[in-house]
A protein has these predicted regions:
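Short active-site loop at a secondary-structure junction
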Residues: 19-25, 44-109, 159-169, 236-239, ...
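Active-site helix/loop module of the DD-peptidase/beta-lactamase fold
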Residues: 56, 71-122, 153, 178, ...
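Short, charged, amphipathic alpha-helices and their helix-cap/turn boundaries
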Residues: 28, 32-40, 83, 124-160, ...
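Catalytic loop of the DD-peptidase/beta-lactamase superfamily, centered on the K-T-G motif
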Residues: 1-42, 49-53, 83, 164-165, ...
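Well-ordered alpha-helical segments within folded domains of soluble proteins
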Residues: 60-64, 171-177, 246-250
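Short, contiguous, well-ordered secondary-structure segments
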Residues: 152-164, 174-183
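The feature captures the short pre-catalytic strand/loop hairpin that immediately precedes
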Residues: 148-158, 221-232, 299
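Extended low-complexity intrinsically disordered regions
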Residues: 1-22, 109-141, 270
Length: 353
């Protein structure tokens, strides 16, 4: 494996990501389970050690925290979410065909994106989407109460837990973050620090909070450089962690090697997969994603599972058990047009083993 997966090979794989016209800079980190393979590089306008927004990869950190809180008997995944919120805030968040299903929604429904609750960020409205405002320079915070207020004006996608139904919704993770804060009595950024950042000595990883902090590299939306400090500071559980590819790798390896929860719990996370088609095409389980890798991509040798999480910013963190290879980094393009560059690099490396 090591003879082919060398410095030149990895550098070429990273450079190839820049051939996507939407990608202006990228970071790629690849490691094997035993670290006999370990490569880190930056191309374009991003350096290997740069901090970047990991965006929705943050949700994998939420999964880890929830599993640890469950192990402490602080909560169960079958808990009804209305138990954690004031009635005036949560009531009416899921009204479908005149029936309020709010009290049927569980933590599992949120964690698996099967609640049916609309996504406040991407949902079409006459006045446009929150994401549209953001990329056109209208940076504004979206705290939980504001997100819920918008969601209550929208029609749910389906009943909570309806068989075969799934809808990717950032609202679900806003709610999960609030539940974590309720259980611990702490801001979720401090919970991340206590449960993950400090135990693993992650000195370049933190929950974005200071809107004057310009340390993270700016994201791009198509050719436009965007900075949205107010928004990023308001969505900690949904996508507000800042990290580096190297430190995201430390977390990823810990996640899949039983450092946060027994390795057997991975079976629970992978028990039920549903295909999501927006904001990308991939499978979603219980707080975890799996890349869509049809056999036609590798007819002679199946790719196998590629598990982890995408971020809308182009951040990624994935693990392929078959080759025991881990991948972290970012293509730093929030339009969705650059994700294929990272996907192709990951698949190419796996196929080369």
């Amino acid at each position: 494996m090591e003879s082919k997966l060398n410095e030149t090979f990895f550098r070429q794989a990273a450079q190839k990501m820049l051939k996507n016209k939407s990608v202006f800079g990228a970071v790629l980190c690849v490691e094997s389970g035993d670290s006999s393979i370990s490569w880190l590089g930056g191309v374009g306008n991003i350096k290997a050690e740069d901090r970047y927004f990991i965006a929705s990869v943050t949700k994998l950190y939420v999964t880890a925290v929830l599993l640890m809180l469950r192990a402490e008997n602080s909560l169960t995944f079958t808990d009804k979410i209305f138990e954690y919120f004031p009635e005036e805030l949560i009531s009416g968040i899921h009204v479908l065909n005149g029936v309020d299903y709010t009290k049927e929604i569980t933590i599992t429904h949120l964690l698996s994106n099967t609640s049916g609750i609309p996504d406040y960020f991407y949902y079409d409205k006459p006045r446009g989407k929150a994401v549209t405002d953001l990329v056109h320079g209208n940076d504004q915070p979206w705290p939980l109460d504001k997100a819920i207020q918008r969601v209550k004006t929208l029609k749910p996608k389906f009943k909570p837990g309806q068989k075969g139904k799934i809808h990717y919704s950032d609202t679900n993770y806003q709610l999960l973050g609030a539940i974590i804060e309720k259980v611990t009595g702490k801001w979720i950024g401090d919970v991340f620090k206590e449960y993950i950042f400090q135990p693993f000595n992650l000195k370049d990883t933190y929950a974005y909070q200071d809107i004057n902090d310009t340390t993270p590299v700016p994201m791009y939306y198509k050719s436009r450089e965007i900075r949205a400090p107010k928004y990023m500071a308001s969505i900690t559980a949904e996508g507000g962690i800042v990290s580096t590819a190297k430190e995201a790798m430390v977390f990823l390896k810990a996640f899949f090697n039983g450092c946060f929860f027994p390795k057997e719990a991975l079976g629970e996370l992978k028990k039920n997969w549903n295909m999501i088609y927006f904001p990308g095409q991939f499978y979603f389980g219980l707080g975890i994603e799996k890349l869509w890798t049809p056999r036609i991509f590798s007819p002679l040798k199946p790719i196998g599972e590629v598990l982890g999480f995408w971020g809308q910013s182009g951040a990624f963190a994935f693990y392929n058990p078959e080759t025991d290879l881990y991948f972290t980094g970012t293509i730093n393009q929030a339009s969705g047009f650059g994700h294929s560059a990272a996907y192709k690099a990951i698949i190419k490396i796996i196929k080369s083993v």
